[in-house]
């Protein structure tokens, strides 16, 4: 009887851990976001990418983008961003920005909205959440990869599904 009870609690804890991790991830996102740019969930973006023309902007550093990015994304380096970099994008086009977790991309999204872009959204949880949800990413050679540049060891804790690359 005692073994069965211990096994039950062990099984319950295993089932409970993933939900706990997502809650913690969501709490972290809530603490980072200013909620100044609408968010789009990974599953909705995945669906839209197959049906609509979307300008997908990766706002991470070039070395992060080189490790992996979402197929079809264009690099808009956060550290060197100028609104003129987006001049080729029509102001009424749908634009989705992302970074590692959504913090840097939200700042770029704010600038795009302030410049008159009408349909800007921020990928919730960034490329980390995209990959955590099991979606495909590609490397600089346009080949599928599981590697994600996690910025540093501290931020690596938020990537649950993939190979963590930093430094």
Regions found by a protein language model. Give the residues of each.
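Bacterial N-terminal signal peptides
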Residues: 8-18
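Active-site-adjacent beta-strand anchor residues
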Residues: 58, 98, 123
